[in-house]
A protein has these predicted regions:
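Alpha-helical transmembrane segments of multi-pass membrane proteins
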Residues: 19-33, 128
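Alpha-helical transmembrane segments of multi-pass integral membrane proteins
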Residues: 106-152
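Hydrophobic alpha-helical transmembrane segments of multi-pass membrane proteins
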Residues: 55-65, 121, 125
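Membrane-helix interface/capping segments
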Residues: 65-85
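Membrane-cytosol interface motif
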Residues: 82-92, 149-152
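Membrane-helix boundary elements
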Residues: 27-61
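Alpha-helical transmembrane segments and their helix-start/interface "positive-inside/aromatic belt" motifs
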Residues: 2-19
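Hydrophobic alpha-helical transmembrane segments of integral membrane proteins
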Residues: 89-116
């Protein structure tokens, strides 16, 4: 069966996002240095902020890259058999990673508060809860599929 256009477009987009994300994560320290040189005169930047923000963004980017890769793994299984326990586990892992990202962003607000940080934290919570909902939906679909396979 031929893969739907939307599925192919999403898979290609995720591969591009993953590649750009890897490049961005690798070059992050240099990008932060350039950013801080430009904005140093405009804002007072606390001592140690550079190390903190690089560590925070590297960890966040790494978690997002894992999430994107797991989404690619799910999309690979769609043409073959989407309703398998492996996809349930992947969706649960994605949900946990999104909640972890939300916690990280809210903890960052204790050190350096920005509206965007709070908005991202809220978005990660909602997306994490949605991933858990999809996980439960897929789990039920797997059970129904296995019951159906046994009756045939």
């Amino acid at each position: 069966m031929r893969e739907p256009l939307v599925s192919r477009a999403l898979k290609i987009s995720l591969y591009i996002i993953f590649a750009v994300g890897v490049c961005g994560t690798i070059t992050l320290p240099w990008m932060i240095d350039s950013y801080m040189r430009i904005l140093y005169d405009a804002y007072y930047i606390q001592e140690g902020y550079r190390r903190f923000i690089i560590a925070f963004l590297m960890l966040s980017a790494s978690l997002v890259l894992v999430i994107v890769w797991e989404m690619i793994r799910i999309l690979r299984s769609v043409p073959i058999d989407p309703f398998v326990m492996r996809n349930v586990k992947i969706l649960r892992q994605i949900g946990l990673l999104l909640i972890l990202l939300a916690v990280m962003f809210f903890l960052k607000c204790l050190y350096y508060v920005t509206f965007l940080t709070m908005a991202c934290g809220c978005m990660f919570v909602v997306c994490g809860l949605f991933a858990f909902t999809l996980c439960n939906l897929f789990r039920q679909a797997v059970v129904f599929k296995e019951e159906n396979d046994l009756t045939i």
